[in-house]
Amino acid sequence: MEYESLSKIYYKRPAEHNKTYFERFNSPLTRHFDFQIQGYNHRNKHPAFFCYTEEFTVLMEKIYKKHEDLLQALQVVPPLVLEQFILSSLVDEVRATSDIEGIHSTRKEIKEVVSGIVQSARFSSIVAKYKSILTDSALMQFKTCEDIRAFYDEFAHKEVTANDPTHKLDGDLFRRDSVSITSPSGKIIHRGVQPEKKIVELLNVTLEILHNPDMPLLARVAIFHYLFEYIHPFYDGNGRTARFIVSYFLARCCWQIMDWGRVIWKA
């Protein structure tokens, strides 16, 4: 039977929603987190949880199989093809991140920045950080709220404030005022966590999940990404920051690909 999200069940078969919710919430395969989720314009809060399912396990297996296939393919491709593959992947990732953030870009523009042909104030920081995943063997620290703020300052803060000075951070570490997330039509669909003290509290919980060795990596990074976006610690640049951190943690598991990348970018 195909897995259905609770939101789908709520709208398709509302009479089954509560029963399914409690079954999943109380399942022996469910992991609970000290994190309360409250939907926009909803009165009640609900404790966050992650229910391991057969579909999730099968999906992880498929992903790891594709990873193995990729490693085997990279063993036989010419260095020039590998270089073009890594360049194309990096360009696609930066462009996808920009598109999600609503920043118009072209593959040509980003490729020129990645290749060092031109310097772009809009993309220089994000490109430099993504290239550092391949060229720098030093570990990045994403263990504390201070680490997240320090990374954001290098990665996105300057570009964010250049685009809109009102988005400059005004709290001790994160934003002090409220922030809203809107749909393409302009409708508010979420408000970030407030006050800053609560942001710090929940982000600490989120970082603990990200670094929990007792959970599968793919589950950890997916949960981290969702909770980080829910918290929304910055006025702008939350999506690109979370996406980079996820990319970094996934890349750390692909040592062979990273080693090849370092050889190419340092050549």
Model segments located where?
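FIC/Doc superfamily catalytic core
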Residues: 1-267
